[in-house]
UniProtKB/Swiss-Prot annotation:
Keywords of this entry: Ribonucleoprotein, Ribosomal protein, RNA-binding, rRNA-binding
A GO MF label: structural constituent of ribosome
Organism field: Aeromonas hydrophila subsp. hydrophila (strain ATCC 7966 / DSM 30187 / BCRC 13018 / CCUG 14551 / JCM 1027 / KCTC 2358 / NCIMB 9240 / NCTC 8049)
Record's subunit section: Part of the 30S ribosomal subunit. Contacts protein S5. The interaction surface between S4 and S5 is involved in control of translational fidelity.
Record-level GO cellular component terms: small ribosomal subunit
Protein name: Small ribosomal subunit protein uS4
General function of this protein: One of the primary rRNA binding proteins, it binds directly to 16S rRNA where it nucleates assembly of the body of the 30S subunit. With S5 and S12 plays an important role in translational accuracy.
The organism's place on the tree of life at top rank: Bacteria
Length: 206
């Protein structure tokens, strides 16, 4: 399945919630018709079956983190093999992706932009260039922008935008140095309450 490159707002409208795919600090406002699905006339949303609700939740989380279907299924399998709550394990694996950590630290305005920074070799982990967006970051890893990439206007702009967002407690960032540390894996209480990971577990458990 190819990665979606169309209008980001369509994905948020499809899921009926702001997926934070745009770079602004403000949530999507009413003029974007978040309560109607994409289409010429904004078709009315049909009542979903239990399976439909579970599928939509999976699609929502997959789109938030920008992960393809096969990748997402593999993350679920890895989460199920770990000890503890499978749903929480899944979210921690997604949060530990390098592109997501770069986004959380504010080096990229969106996860898509952060993925591009990683792919273009603008990011280092513990002093080494890593260009794999799915690379799993471990607690105490140090993430920084490469010296030659620090002049990029988009990174400076992203840090300014990030300064207006609520800062994640599981990362520490020195904006002046464009460097940060992944202090720990986020706990469930740290993450969005708008995600119901149990629905995803129920979907894949069938």
């Amino acid at each position: 399945m190819a990665r979606y490159i169309g209008p980001k707002l369509k994905l948020s409208r499809r899921e009926g919630t702001d997926l934070f795919l745009k770079s602004g600090v403000r949530a999507i406002d009413s003029k974007c018709k978040i309560d109607t699905v994409p289409g010429q006339h904004g078709a009315r949303k049909a009542r979903l079956s239990d399976y439909g609700v579970q599928l939509r939740e999976k699609q929502k989380v997959r789109r938030i983190y920008g992960v393809l279907e096969k990748q997402f299924r593999n993350y679920y399998r890895d989460a199920a093999r770990q000890k503890g709550n499978t749903g929480e394990n899944l979210l921690q694996l997604l949060e530990g992706r390098l592109d997501n950590v770069v986004y959380r630290m504010g080096f990229g305005a969106t996860r898509a932009e952060s993925r591009q920074l990683v792919s273009h070799k603008a990011i280092m982990v513990n002093g080494r260039v890593v260009n794999i967006p799915s690379f799993q970051v471990s607690p105490e890893d140090v993430i920084c922008v490469r010296e030659k990439a620090k002049k990029q206007a988009r990174i400076k702009a992203s840090l300014e935008v990030a300064g207006q967002r609520e800062k994640p407690t599981w990362v520490e960032v020195d904006a002046a140095k464009m460097e940060g540390a992944f202090k720990r894996l986020p706990e469930r209480s740290d993450l969005s309450a708008d995600i119901n990971e149990q629905l995803i577990v129920e979907l894949y458990s069938k």
